[in-house]
Amino acid sequence: MAKMGSRKHLKTYKAPKTWPIHPKEDTWTVKPSAGSHSIENSLSLTLVIRDILKLADNSREAKRIINSGNVLVDGRVIKDYKFPVGFMDIIEIPKTGEVYRVLLDKKGRLQLNKIEENDSKLCKIVNKSTIKGGKIQVNLHDGKNVIIDENDYNVGDVIDLKVPDHEINEVFELKEGACVLITGGKHTGELGTVSEIIVNESSNPNTIIIENSAKDEFLTLKDYAFVVGEDAPAISLLEVNK
């Protein structure tokens, strides 16, 4: 008997809360394949084409569009209908000229935000290591990695990455005054400015104090802060994020 995790489809009522789908509209949806994003934090390309963008009436039509090479993710043609797209990924439909960035709304759901640019992506540094030759490899939140000569970047900083070439355009430091989008906890999807970073000496995770547009402050985990600009957003965001 096949394991539950190996099934290609998933009943919609069992889908993660991050998926913007309605159980009453469809019984089944397509699970994203294992990849750069976890199942909870990604959507299958079929779900995006059929359910969100409404470019297909059913899975068969969505697969045809995808298999024809009519969808790009981060500047690369993707023909895998189960391909996982997640936070900050750039989806492009060349035939319509439309480009979207995957973001989180305040309910923690993955949503598409229509944008103009298609060659710039924000990627958070989740860890780094020294490799052969003394160079530094920084590993990013979407599974990508970039090799740099100098150890100038810290975990938590965000790279403005040119796609698909993986060239670094700019780096946004996670520091006081930085503009951040919260990606977890009860403040998911909120935009704010870093007021203070609290480093705990114990095994407890580091925390961060954020000031929102109403000048109210809240405490959240440092890991939940995703820098989107130095003192203002460098990218377009969902209206609900602002």
UniProtKB/Swiss-Prot annotation:
Keyword Ribonucleoprotein applies: yes
Q: What is an example of a GO molecular function annotated in this UniProt entry? A: structural constituent of ribosome
Entry's NCBIfam families? PRK04313.1
Q: What is this protein called?
A: Small ribosomal subunit protein eS4
Task: Tell me the ranges covered by the S4 RNA-binding domain, including all copies.
Answer: 43-106
Keyword vocabulary terms for this entry: Ribonucleoprotein, Ribosomal protein, RNA-binding, rRNA-binding
PROSITE patterns from the entry?
S4
Q: Which InterPro entries match?
A: Rib_uL2_dom2 (IPR014722), Ribosomal_eS4 (IPR000876), Ribosomal_eS4_central_region (IPR013845), Ribosomal_eS4_central_sf (IPR038237), Ribosomal_eS4_KOW (IPR041982), Ribosomal_eS4_N (IPR013843), S4_RNA-bd (IPR002942), S4_RNA-bd_sf (IPR036986)
Identify the domain of life: Archaea
SUPFAM superfamilies found in the cross-reference section? Alpha-L RNA-binding motif
Bilayer-spanning residue ranges: none
